[in-house]
Amino acid sequence: MAKPATIKIRLNSTADTGFFYVTKKNPRTMTEKMVQRKYDPVAKKHVEFKEGKIK
């Protein structure tokens, strides 16, 4: 069996609310850490989410 091309990552909120999203990325094409601006329902506004490892 071949190794999967995508890995699961965790996008942690920079608002320090503890909220996170789980998404996938291809580490061969996206070598840098992923940063996205998404909605944080705990903070009730859009904030940046930065990539972290799934424990």
Swiss-Prot record:
Signal peptide limits: none
Coiled coil: none
Keyword annotations of the record: Ribonucleoprotein, Ribosomal protein
Pfam family name, one: Ribosomal_L33
PROSITE patterns noted in UniProt: RIBOSOMAL_L33
Record-level GO cellular component terms: cytosolic large ribosomal subunit
Family, similarity comment: Belongs to the bacterial ribosomal protein bL33 family.
HAMAP family referenced in this protein's UniProt entry, alphabetically: Ribosomal_bL33
This protein's name: Large ribosomal subunit protein bL33
Organism of origin: Hyphomonas neptunium (strain ATCC 15444)
Taxon lineage: Bacteria, Pseudomonadati, Pseudomonadota, Alphaproteobacteria, Hyphomonadales
